[in-house]
Amino acid sequence: MAESGLAMWPSLLLLLLLPGPPPVAGLEDAAFPHLGESLQPLPRACPLRCSCPRVDTVDCDGLDLRVFPDNITRAAQHLSLQNNQLQELPYNELSRLSGLRTLNLHNNLISSEGLPDEAFESLTQLQHLCVAHNKLSVAPQFLPRSLRVADLAANQVMEIFPLTFGEKPALRSVYLHNNQLSNAGLPPDAFRGSEAIATLSLSNNQLSYLPPSLPPSLERLHLQNNLISKVPRGALSRQTQLRELYLQHNQLTDSGLDATTFSKLHSLEYLDLSHNQLTTVPAGLPRTLAILHLGRNRIRQVEAARLHGARGLRYLLLQHNQLGSSGLPAGALRPLRGLHTLHLYGNGLDRVPPALPRRLRALVLPHNHVAALGARDLVATPGLTELNLAYNRLASARVHHRAFRRLRALRSLDLAGNQLTRLPMGLPTGLRTLQLQRNQLRMLEPEPLAGLDQLRELSLAHNRLRVGDIGPGTWHELQALQVRHRLVSHTVPRAPPSPCLPCHVPNILVSW
C-alpha cells in the first residue's frame, strides 16, 4: 500500500501543475487582482515634458523643443507646439496624427525647406492651423480641405498656390498679414472654391493694387499698410456682404478710385482710407456706411454731391487734411442727417463750419485757425454734447456772449490753448467738464460760473491766475467740482462770509 501511495504522487503532482478549465464568462470576480495585472490604470502616452490634460490634447508650449516630439498619441485632436525652436516638420510623424483638428505651430523657426509639400496631406480632419511667426518664404502648396482657420501671418511668404487656400468649402478666416506678398505671388484663383471666407487679412505686405477674384463671401478685408495705388474697376463688385474695409496707409490717389469702386458694397459699414493721397472725398459711397476715415490725406474741399449717397453716415473723420476757409462750404454736410461725430482736428479752418447736421453730438475742431465764435455759429446743432475748440485763436473779445445759448445738452467743452483772458459768458448749465488750461486768464468771476452746479472738472492750469484774482463767491455753486490733474496745487481760500449767501463753500483744489 505504501509503495502504491508513493507511486501516485507523480500523477497528483502533474494534475496540480496542469492548467485548469477556462473561466466561465460572467463568473469572474472583477475586483480580484489577477496575476501580472496592476490595480493602477495604464498611463497615457505623453511626450516628455509636455502635458496631456485630456486624452485628445497634447500641449508642448514653450519647452524650447528643437525636434518634433515623438510618442504623441494617435488619438490627439489638439496639438500645441507654439513658442519652441522647431525648424522642420517630419512627414512621418505628422502622418500618424490623422485625427488632428487643431495644430498650433506659432512662433517657431520653421522654414519652407523644413515643411514638405505633403506635410499636411494626411490631416484630413484639420480645422485650425497656425504657422504664424515662423520663417516660411512660400506658403504650403496643399492644405487640407477640412480647414476652417488658417494663420500664416508674420512669416516671409512671397507666394501662395491655388490649393493653399483654394477648394476649401469650410474655410472662414485667412491671416496673411506681415509677409512679403506682391500681386505676382497671389494667383488669380487663390481662393477659388472657398466660398465661405469671411475674414481675409493681407495687411503689411507689398501689394500695389487690390487683388482680383476675392471671395464674394468676405465680411472683413484688411489691406492696410501696402503699396496700393489703385483699385481696379470691378474688383469689389461681388463683395456684397463686405462690412469692414481697411485701406489705410497705402498710396491711393483720386485716379486710383472711381464712382463704382465702392458702389456695389451694399453691406459696407466701416471704410478706412486714412493716410493716403486723396484730394477729394471718394464718389459712390454706399448708403449703409456708418464710419468713414479720411484723416491724413490731402483733401481741400468736401463736396455735398460726394456724400449724397452716404446718408447713413454716423462718424466722419477728416483730421489732418488741408481744409481751409472754403473747405466745408454751407450745406456740404447737409446730406448727413444722422451724423453723430465730426472730426476736423488739424486743418486750416478759420470758423466753425456753417449749416452742420442738426443731430450732431460731437464736434472736434482743435488745432485749426478759428478766431471767433458768433452768436449763430452753433445754433444749428442744439444736440451737441461734446465741443472741442482747443488750440485755436479764440480771444475773449471775439467770443459772443450768446455763442453757447442753444447748447443745452453740452456736457464737455474744451477751450484749452486759446487766447482767452476771461471766462466766456453764457456757458451751458449742464456742463460737466470745462477745459481752460493754457490760456491767458487773469481773473475768475462768479457770474460766468453761475448755475454750473453739474460741473465735475475744471482745468485752469498754465494761465496767469493768482490766488487773489479769484473773486468772492466764485466757487459757491460748484459743489461737485473735482480737479483730477494738477501740477502745482493751491487750496483755494474760502471766501469771507457774505450777508446774502450761506458760507458753505467747497474746499477745491485748482491747478495753475
From Swiss-Prot:
InterPro entries: Leu-rich_rpt (IPR001611), Leu-rich_rpt_typical-subtyp (IPR003591), LRR_dom_sf (IPR032675), SLRP (IPR050333)
UniProt modification remark: N-glycosylated.
Keywords for this protein: Extracellular matrix, Glycoprotein, Leucine-rich repeat, Repeat, Secreted, Signal
Keyword Nuclease: no
Keyword Secreted tagged: yes
Assigned GO CC terms: collagen-containing extracellular matrix; extracellular matrix; extracellular space
Signal sequence interval, chain numbering: 1-26
Molecular function (Gene Ontology), one example: extracellular matrix structural constituent
Name recorded for this polypeptide: Podocan-like protein 1
Organism name: Homo sapiens (Human)
Organism lineage: Eukaryota, Metazoa, Chordata, Craniata, Vertebrata
